[in-house]
Amino acid sequence: MENLFDKMNHLKVLVIGDVMADAYIRGKVERISPEAPVPVLNSRHYEIRLGGAANVALNLKALGAKVYLCSLVGQDSKGEELIKLIDAEDIGSEGIVRSQSRPTTIKTRIIAAGQHLLRIDEEDDRPAFPDEKSSLLKKALALTALVDAVVFEDYDKGVIFPELIQEVTALALKRGIPVTVDPKKRNFTDYKGVTLFKPNLKELREGLKIELNPKNSAELEAACKRTVSDLGVQGVLLTLSENGMAIYADGTYHHTPAMQRDIADVSGAGDTVISVATACMAVGFDLKSTLILANMAGGLVCEYSGVVPIQKDILVKEALLVLGEQSQ
């Protein structure tokens, strides 16, 4: 198993999707505003981190991979700051297109005493313009020819579009490399033929237009099986929050319960799950081990406040303990 984790250090992965900045304003609340019944925050600290598809890139980098990003950011100061953060992490930014028509997506969280008071979103989620789509497609195809795996990280912010999905997937599968997807509603049915499709329960309900009981294994298995059939995907990894995760591929269904954790913040857990699942598939972990490791990693990052990447050494240590026990 340790050899497979070591192989991650030689991976090259392309992440295509919606990059954004996760900003945090932390401070102290000691009074209510005289102007309206709202708390007054005395701001003490401001921080910007990489978010969205860029957080997936951070997670893959933390696992040892060389990562490239393909995305769209605004021709603005926040875009400049975001690209500087990406470059500082030694993540390839040559696939990023600058847009004159939209701002860089930024999500600002207002926090006091460890509690979220408010989130402010600055974004434009319209589809990319034709010239932007052309640039994105050209860059994505060039990078797909160089890597060992491709991730589509879709936040419905306009970066990903059907032609991009189809052409990148076709090239990747022709090269024999895995294509994994963290989908959203807009492009849900366009990810045909990908290697692994990772919706959460809400996304699967909306995508299939059905009700699902997260505690009913028969319903979940049937929904995963239908997704494989309808989209022609090779496998489905379904995240179920406190009910764990399930994976369906090759006619086989596995479920693993959520591990007991001290949850501080669930932000970014889905990014970690798709990152770990992608790396596991690219180096040769079997389906059940991929499920267990992705579930484990998603839980580990929830123990920290804010959006943070996985710590590989902690994941490896826990994986050796848990998977080692299961193999005995």
Annotated model-derived regions:
Residues 158-253:
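Conserved phosphate/ATP/ADP-binding segment of small-molecule kinases
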Residues 1-30:
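Positively charged, low-complexity intrinsically disordered leader regions
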Residues 14-16, 119, 148-151, 180, ...:
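Structural motif
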Residues 146-159:
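Short acidic, glycine-rich surface-loop motifs adjacent to enzyme active sites
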Residues 8, 144-145, 188-191:
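A short, aliphatic-rich alpha-helical micro-motif
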Residues 96-102, 109-144:
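Conserved phosphate-binding/catalytic loop of the ribokinase/pfkB sugar-kinase fold
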Residues 2-4, 34, 38-106, 318:
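Substrate-binding N-lobe of the ribokinase-like
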Residues 230-234, 259-322:
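Conserved post-catalytic alpha-helical subdomain immediately downstream of the catalytic base
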